[in-house]
């Protein structure tokens, strides 16, 4: 995004001193997010049970958004050098968590970038399908699918009661 602003300023002959303030305005606006109604409570429940990492192709800042306390790590494609669905960014996140990729559940809302990408990289995939879309890949099916983050937290509570002790370790 910064490079796009820089290019636009150069092409228009504008003052390049505007680059930093313009990017800061964009970045501040980018980090003003509206949470889904279930997101905060569910994220708190999940993070209390499991180590959670944020993996993003975007440039959101968990500190600015106010969610950093729920995540052990934040991995962004720009810093990593590759983006989802490339396997290396999923693998790097697993390494940061110290968890074998076969034991990591990647939760995402984009069928290809998140779920299929994670599964091709050797992780388990959970599709957060809030809009009721139809899965289109006949060769690969998500391990789990939920319409809300609360449903995932409920599933973890019901099926994985031993995980709370692991999260504290």
Where are these regions (language model features)?
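Alpha-helix C-capping/helix-to-loop hinge sites
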Residues: 8-12, 29, 77-78
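Surface-exposed cleft-lining segments at the edges of enzyme active sites
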Residues: 24-32
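Asp-based, Mg2+/Mn2+-dependent phosphohydrolase catalytic module
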Residues: 14-16, 40, 44, 48-169
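Active-site periphery "cap/insert" segments of enzyme catalytic domains
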Residues: 32-38
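A metal-dependent, Asp-based hydrolase signature
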Residues: 1-24
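Conserved donor sugar-nucleotide recognition element shared by glycan-biosynthetic enzymes
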Residues: 1, 35, 86
């Amino acid at each position: 995004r910064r490079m796009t602003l820089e290019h636009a300023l150069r092409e228009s002959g504008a003052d390049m001193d505007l680059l930093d303030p313009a990017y800061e305005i964009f970045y501040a606006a980018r980090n003003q997010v509206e949470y889904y109604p279930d997101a905060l409570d569910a994220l708190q429940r999940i993070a209390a049970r499991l180590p959670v990492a944020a993996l993003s192709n975007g440039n959101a800042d968990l500190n600015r958004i106010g969610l950093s306390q729920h995540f052990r790590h934040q991995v962004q494609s720009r810093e990593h050098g590759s983006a989802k669905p490339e396997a290396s960014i999923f693998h790097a996140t697993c390494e940061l968590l110290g968890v074998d990729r076969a034991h990591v559940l990647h939760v995402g809302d984009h069928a290809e970038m998140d779920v299929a990408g994670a599964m091709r990289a050797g992780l388990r995939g959970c599709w957060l399908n809030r809009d009721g879309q139809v899965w289109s890949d006949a060769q690969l099916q998500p391990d789990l699918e939920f319409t809300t983050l609360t449903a995932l937290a409920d599933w973890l509570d019901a099926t994985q009661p031993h995980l709370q002790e692991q999260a504290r370790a």
